[in-house]
Each structure stands twice: as structure tokens, then as C-alpha cells.
Amino acid sequence: MKRHEMVAKHLVMFYYFAQHLWPEQNIRDSFQKVTLRRYRKCGYENLQLRKGCKSVVECKQHKGDYSGLNQCLKTTLSKIFQCNKYVEVFHKISNSNRHKMRHTENKHFKCKECRKTFCMLSHLTQHKRIQTRVNFYKCEAYGRAFNWSSTLNKHKRIHTGEKPYKCKECGKAFNQTSHLIRHKRIHTEEKPYKCEECGKAFNQSSTLTTHNIIHTGEIPYKCEKCVRAFNQASKLTEHKLIHTGEKRYECEECGKAFNRSSKLTEHKYIHTGEKLYKCEECGKAFNQSSTLTTHKRIHSGEKPYKCEECGKAFKQFSNLTDHKKIHTGEKPYKCEECGKAFNQLSNLTRHKVIHTGEKPYKCGECGKAFNQSSALNTHKIIHTGENPHKCRESGKVFHLSSKLSTCKKIHTGEKLYKCEECGKAFNRSSTLIGHKRIHTGEKPYKCEECGKAFNQSSTLTTHKIIHTEEKQYKCDECGKAST
């Protein structure tokens, strides 16, 4: 049988479909380059139809819309619509038409609220739902609502723990296909998203978007409660949970709850001990790729985040945000117990332990307990003897990068932290905080034995020796001991 080709613009059904679906926008989609191949005689009036339909014109079903006409056509017919830009084949004219629109700059569907335009009606509908926050699909477990049933189904996997998508390389499972695709790039080292500004490549488009803000300096998402700003909408949403105190994600192992699913996932590694991300430079392993990326900057010395006020650079964006508060004097985090304010949430959390006396972090080696996880990590190095941070100036080695930074300031003489009261400058923010207590008269460290209070924890430690009558310092010459 001879094969004929027919240019789609000659088909009445195409013109009818476009005119019927979008009459207001007056869309006349061009089909001259789209070819429809068939094995019978060309001409729309001779299309093979189902029983009872003599011609397209007489067919009653197609008068409603295009889908009706499509039902009339025999499914065995070869209907191939090829996109000109990419070699993609479609078995439905609607799919071909929808796909082609993505390559054009014509966006005929406009949102009346924000004036944003879209090339497809479905995209506009989706956009409107987000704007009006019409959440049709609700989670029965926590009451959280979603715009789409597919999003609800994905969300439900958080509660059920279902992870149907497994990595063939390492066996790790995920609850979403997108997460598996993203994970696979760890093994392939593929980085398809490249920054046009500096050439740096990333394995996620979201990471590139976040990175671009380094160059623009844009922080568009602002918290109404504490005026803190973020470069990502997701980070603002996460931050808001601090104010509400809501913690939806609970660890089945120990019962600890978190306000983010990612934090729960991160926490679970404490129980499993799993560390997938290894540093090629020193062999140290991490449970998060982002932590590995930050760690690598210790070796490279890269500090991409620079303060416009004083020129100081940082390895992490969060460190720059915290640093800026030194210049602005902003202290959004206040202690409900004593009214003291802080420029960082972590500092407030650390401060609260003074009132509670809680020490949840215990060393598995010697049993010593700490009020901060960072303090426990620092302590653990006593047992391992690890000192990865070396000062090039003095040759001194440190187990913490912060200690190395302090050492470097001794050589440079740099003193960034200045007291507004007397003008005295310091090379560490913690020293400035301790110094300020001289002016305020604050003494947060109290002796349980006699009730005497001190402005520094080290002074309290020294004072406690009086009660224990411990003679720590002995003279080698005469043997006399003193406190």
C-alpha cells in the first residue's frame, strides 16, 4: 500500500480544535511543519471512522470537542506528530501541540492577579491554585493540605516510610523518583547546571539558583515575625516553624521530633552511623553532601561569601548572615527567662542551658555529658588525638577550624569585634561578649556552693577550687601548693 503524507494545516479538525478550545486568545497554532502519516487515501473526509459514522462532518460525537472526534478515529491508525525542535514522537495531536508551545515565546494565558503569562492553560490553572492557596487534598495524619493529589501521595510516604525507588549502585532507597535521579549524580559525578557568572557547576538546578544569589546578593523572602530574610522560599517556610514550635517529623528510634523532614533524615544517621559522602583529600566521611561541600573549603580555603561592610569572607552563607548582625546590632532572639537577646538562634539555645542545666550530649568513650553537640564533637578529639587544622604561620595544629582562625588573628593583629561602650577591640566575638559584662554588670555563672556569681564560666571554675580545697599548682622548688 502506497504511503501518503498530508500537511496538518489542511485538516479541518485541527483548526476546529484550536478555535474551540481557545476562542478568547484567538490562537491559530501553525501546523504547516507537522506531518501526519497514514496508510490510506489522503483527505480528512476519508478518515476511517467507527461503525455508524459515514464521515467526520456527520459524526455527532466530534461536535462537542476534539476528544469526541479522537474517539471516532480507529485506534489502529498511525497518527505520528513530530516536533521540529527535538526528535520526539507523539501519538496524540494534543500532546504534540502542548509540547510545541514550550518552544515558542507566545504566552497567551495571563493571570489577572499578578499579570504573569503562561503558554498553556493548565499552567495558568496550576499557578492560580498556588496563589489562592486552594488546597483540595488533605493529609489525615497531620492535616496538611496540598494543591495536587500526586503531591499528597508523595507526602504520605513520609508517614508510611515507603521508599519504592532504589539506587542500583548502592542500594539506597527514596520516596520520590526526583530524589533518586538527584542521588544518582553522586555516583556519576554529573553536574549539568552551570553558573554563567563564574562557571561553577552543580548537580541540582535548585543549588544553582541558590548559588546565583551570591552574585546578585538578593534575599527576597522575609519573615514577618523576626524580620529575618532568606534567599529561598523553602528556607523561610522552615524558619517559620521556629516561631510556631511545630514539629511534625518524629524519629521512631528515640522519639525526638523535628520541624523538617530533612532534619529527621539527618538525625537518623546518628542511629545508623551511615556516612555516604567521603572527602577525597583527608578521607573524612559525612552524612550529608552539603556538609562535605562545606568541609572541602577547609582544604581549598575558598570563602565565597563576602561582607560588603568590612570585607570579611566566609565559607558558608549562614555565617555571613550571622556576621552582618555585628554591624547592624540586630538581636532578634530573646530569652524568655532573663530577657537577654542574641543575634543568633544557636546562641540563644546555648544560653538557655544556663537556666535548665540540661546536658543531653554524652560521650560514648568516657561518659562525660555536654549541653551542645559541638562541644561533644570537640571533646571526642581528645580520645582520637586528631588535629587536622594547621597554622602556616606558627606551625601550631588545632582540632577545630575556629581555633585556627583565632590563631591566625594573633599573627595578623586583626580585631574585628569592637566594644561600643569603651572602644576596645577583640579578635573573637566571644571575648567581646565576656568583656561587655564589665559594663552591664551581668553575672550569669553562679556557684551552687556559696551563691557567688561571676561574669565568666572560667572564673567560676577557678572559684570552685576554694570549696574543694584542691591544690592544683605546686612549686617545684619548695613543694608548696596553692589554688
Swiss-Prot record:
PROSITE patterns: ZINC_FINGER_C2H2_1 (PS00028), ZINC_FINGER_C2H2_2 (PS50157). It comes from the Eukaryota. Transmembrane segments: none annotated. InterPro entries: Znf_C2H2_sf, Znf_C2H2_type. A zinc finger (C2H2-type) spans 109-131, 137-159, 165-187, 193-215, 221-243, 249-271, 277-299, 305-327, 333-355, 361-383, 389-411, 417-439, 445-467. Pfam families: zf-C2H2 (PF00096), zf-H2C2_2 (PF13465). GO terms for biological process: regulation of DNA-templated transcription. It is found in: Nucleus. GO terms for cellular component: nucleus. Its main location: nucleus. This is Zinc finger protein 117. The gene is ZNF117.
